[in-house]
Amino acid sequence: DYCVPAGLVAQSQAKDGTVTDLRVSDDHEVTLPMACLVNESTAGGAELFANALRKMSGANLVGTTTAGMGVLLSDPQSFSDGSAAVITVGLLLANEGETWNGAGLTPDVDAALTADEQSSYYDFTVQTDPQISRAVNAVLALVG
């Protein structure tokens, strides 16, 4: 992966307590200051990715607290009536072993939209979006 260095990205913990390391397969990362925009819709694998950027590459998370869905799901099981089901089989853990399940990831830089900004959300451009502006400022702060 070009965003994080080789190493321990996260761990999975099965219901029986067995912990398995999840690793990145290469060491070809690009070392640049980064920010990752997150909000309450950032869930599951997106939280895993955002947390890996933060922990392994020093990225700032910018936005609002994430959904807190740090769980592992089974492969879908199909049934004869056409329905399918997945079940939770474990937890995702950050590379230090803590879980964000139920709590979410707290951003390094708060970028909650005001009520006025929320009502104008679909009118924003890259140049006028206040959350993108906060993310750019976070990256500039990393550069020094």
Annotate each language-model stretch with its function.
Residues 1-44, 70-79, 93:
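Gly/Ser/Thr-rich loop/hinge elements
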Residues 2, 10-13, 33-39, 52, ...:
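Soluble periplasmic/extracytoplasmic beta-strand elements of cell-envelope proteins
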Residues 5, 96-103, 110, 115-144:
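Intrinsically disordered, Ser/Thr/Pro/Gly-rich linkers and terminal tails that flank
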Residues 18-28, 48-56, 97-112:
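Hydrophobic transmembrane alpha-helix bundles
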Residues 26-28, 75-78, 84, 96, ...:
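Short, surface-exposed patches at the edges or C-terminal ends of soluble domains, predominantly
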Residues 31-34, 46-50, 54, 59, ...:
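Extracytoplasmic/secreted envelope proteins and their assembly/folding machinery
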Residues 56-70:
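Short, well-structured beta-strand/strand-turn elements
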